[in-house]
Amino acid sequence: HLLHAETFFRGIPMVRWKNRDQAQPELRIVLIDTIGLLAGLYRGADIAYVGAGFTTGVHNTMEPASMGLPVFFGPRYDNALEAKEMIELGCAFSIDSTENFESRFLPLLQNPELTRKLGAQAQQFIESQAHASEQCLPLILGNL
């Protein structure tokens, strides 16, 4: 998958995490090839692409959204209700082709204001869901 990303983004300053050099301020894209880093990295990101949306079903889309990031993922997101809801709100994007990805992702790279706006919408959505466990607990306890 990383080779596909490297090919697709050829021409945009990019590096794999394991090959990064601290003195690379011109980087626009960092491909994460190490486990256990995402939560911390989302804090410094502008946009997130969440994996497994082309295979088994998208991974956690709430984590980057909670950090105020617009979220991208592949077409297999039936396992994530929040992904569906964020698509409806316009702060998350399911992509199924290179053309679809280009038409949605590249404008955000070129428009930081729009990126921040969509990220704020994603974060507001997650915050609006914060009391879901309080609503579910009585239902769970009532069925024990």
Describe these PLM feature segments.
Residues H1-L144:
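Nucleotide-activated sugar donor-binding and catalytic core shared by glycosyltransferases
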